[in-house]
Amino acid sequence: RHTQNSADTDRYGAETGPGLNAEIAKQTLPCYGISLGDITYSEGSRNSTPSMEIIRGHFSRVNMPIFNVMGNHDYTYYNTNASIDTSPESSTINLVSQRSFENVFGPINFSFDRGNVHFVCMKNIYFESTPQSKWNAGDYEGGFTDAEYQWLVQDLEKTPKTMKVVLCVHIPISTSNGPNISKVKNLLKSFTNSIVFSGHTHYQRTVYEGNRLYEQIHAAVCGQWWWSRIEGDGCPNGYTIHYFKDTDIKDAYFIGVNEGMNIRDYQMRIYKGNLRTGGKYAYFQQSHGENEYLINVFNGDEKWKIKVYENGVYAGQPTWIPTNKYTFNTGSSGQTHTIPSSSSQDWWAIGYHIGVCKRGTSGSSYQTNNYHMWKWTAIDPTAKIKVEAEDPYGNVYTCEDVVTDGLNYPDYIKSPLTIF
């Protein structure tokens, strides 16, 4: 996802594709892939849509069929000061600007069945579609046009209520209030255990809406726009594998694509709570105590069970840190920012991208939120810590490695093209 130039597409071909094929080779069931949008990185007057054909070539070398959802950066954008020329065949801005995607990847709204699961892939980037209006790449929200909603109604009318419905979109619907979002949710809730697969955010998160609908927001294989091999929330650049049996997901796990993070057991990272992270462009000082630990469980949510052992003896359960995004103005180069203990973010990952790579030194796009951070206060400050994390499917993962030096970043998280 998010390929803008040849360096980006080369990394997809060198890292993501082989990583996918290595994992596919381990499977005993037929595999299918869904790309959740932002395959390219078009914005404003910058068009990256020509790279779609290059990425399609890389997709063709992945050993499974890949279905594609359109993202907000997959439009053909024009200069924001130029009018959009429409035609009878493409009478709105939306239609004009989605043609490049359709020409390479096919329809933007479609569905298919696999067993007793009905997959629906839809575009849910909503722009004001006034012909001849001025185009602004940022003037969108998560939503569906009336025509798209009616298409979904007709599609689901043909689907038995006994089937599981998986709606695949780009922008998360659990955090969107755009046109027809609530209607789409109600449609999905008329089926048992519907699920939404989405992307867009560059972080991993699960959102439960009662017992009839939940959303899995997937991290990006490009991480922080290919500047490293980790996401802004600390997850590896990676993807999630879901195993379906009849109408249930019987197992699922997140996995990275790069060596050092491409094994199933790599599901978390532990930090000392008082780390100083970053580099010469910005430093970040955590405010937790010396005997406190932060535990980032990459795919963790409220249904995970986290346990801590000290010197091999069960010591208790850590406390989930309520989601809280701390933002700041970067200030002068090399400045140290004190991070409040209420922040749930992964400042080891943020520190690398901002402080070492000098990315996101203005704005907050690199100050990524985190929804899966826990805190543990050691009973014995000298004890050896082990964390055990059990997912909702009964899989148990353990970690004993603790990051104690926040300024020493391992090579396996670094981009091969931007070694700092």
Regions flagged by a language model, labelled:
Residues 1-47, 418-419:
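N-terminal active-site segment of His-dependent metallophosphoesterases
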Residues 2, 37-38, 71-72, 170, ...:
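Active-site glycine-centered loops adjacent to acidic/histidine catalytic or metal-binding residues
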Residues 36, 40, 156-175:
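Short acidic, glycine-rich surface-loop motifs adjacent to enzyme active sites
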Residues 213-300, 304-313, 371-400:
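Binuclear metal-dependent phosphoesterase catalytic core
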Residues 304-339, 343-344:
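Extended low-complexity, serine/threonine- and proline-enriched intrinsically disordered segments
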Residues 394-420:
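Short beta-strand elements
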